[in-house]
Amino acid sequence: MSSMTPQEIVSELDRHIVGQSGAKRAVAIALRNRWRRQQVDPALRQEITPKNILMIGPTGVGKTEIARRLARLADAPFIKVEATKFTEVGYVGKDVDSIVRDLVEVAVKQTREADVKKVRARAEDAAEDRILDVLIPTARTGEQPADSTARQVFRKKLREGQLDDKEIEIDVADARPQLEIMGPQGMEEMAEQLRGMFSQMGHERRKARKLRIAEALKLLTDEEAGKLVNEEEVKTRALQNAEQNGIVFIDEIDKVATRQEAGGSDVSRQGVQRDLLPLVEGTTVSTKYGMVKTDHILFITSGAFHLAKPSDLIPELQGRFPIRVELESLSVGDFEAILTQTHASLVKQYQALLATEGVTLEFVPEGITRLAHIAFEVNERTENIGARRLSTVMERLLDEVSFDAAKLSGQTVRVDAAYVDGRLASLSQNEDLSRYIL
């Protein structure tokens, strides 16, 4: 669980996302409250439920990017899902309970990786011993002491990488092919249980394999680490981590909102909302690792709400998202900042890509300003897709350089206002062309 302060979280988000201070503050406070709750007396802790968040804003302004970055900062089980993938039970689509099952899988993976990291040094020592037993067979027969001079010499060579290319034959667990069982829609849990049941049938088989020592060492280290990790303890802690610290981000929630004026039958849109409701307000979901309570899982939802309004969601679901954050559309200045100030901006990405072929890409401020203006104008005249427009415009701008990069090796390409206008101005001014090309 991350112990970063709200200011630190916002500062980290600022490195990747321009503007949207309201949304950043909301998720930062929500994440910090997860940590605060863990410090509270256990009797009161159970009564403190998370304040779920609804983010509203047009496409391409940073809603999904905030979720992606939050996942890396949270240091807690985190899953992002699309609301459109789920349908009411009885229709074609995924069962909403699979959200919790997937969250638990993430928690188990995180917990196991953390435990493997702790025992890594012991596992590496055990793997080295197994390789040395193959290299110096006499050590196994008792003719020489286990820590003989020869063994120490070989251990030193092994650690220095001098033996990496030597081939040896070792016994390793035979990884049998995974039995794939295709369950019907909404029956993913049953299919998972059947897979687990079949995988446990029969004894573990071992097989002799001839491998380079470098590969054998990695394989044996993973095998030894698996023996040192207590799987039952991993499952118990992972379930608790998912229940107490889990975060679920549901994107495109507006797509399951039913518009009041819409006629005809909406394919179970309200049904999806009603199925999500118990999950958000607190229920118990059965997973292959055990029962999971969702009372303290934090839910963050987002949607553009172009056609529907937040008030079109069923009232019970609206009430479960007390924190509403509206994200603003991006301005020309925001586009410029995205191109120049973010940690891994498109400008830096293209410069790094073309540098691999010896081409130096130099962006001057006037060129970036003109590029931002063109992206903004195209968004205004056609569909507003926010910052995603910059990717389309940049790809078109550097199409020629990217194609001829091998011929331009050793040269510097200067991207100024004239360069941008020469390649994009005619396209951006022609609405038909910009609609289909930019």
Curated annotation (Swiss-Prot):
It is found in: Cytoplasm. One of its GO terms (cellular component) is HslUV protease complex. Its main location: cytoplasm. InterPro entries: AAA+_ATPase, ATP-dep_Clp_protease_ClpX, ATPase_AAA_core, Clp_ATPase_C, HslU, P-loop_NTPase. SMART domains: AAA (SM00382), ClpB_D2-small (SM01086). HAMAP family: HslU (MF_00249). PANTHER family: ATP-DEPENDENT CLP PROTEASE ATP-BINDING SUBUNIT CLPX-LIKE, MITOCHONDRIAL-RELATED, ATP-DEPENDENT PROTEASE ATPASE SUBUNIT HSLU. A double ring-shaped homohexamer of HslV is capped on each side by a ring-shaped HslU homohexamer. The assembly of the HslU/HslV complex is dependent on binding of ATP. This is ATP-dependent protease ATPase subunit HslU.
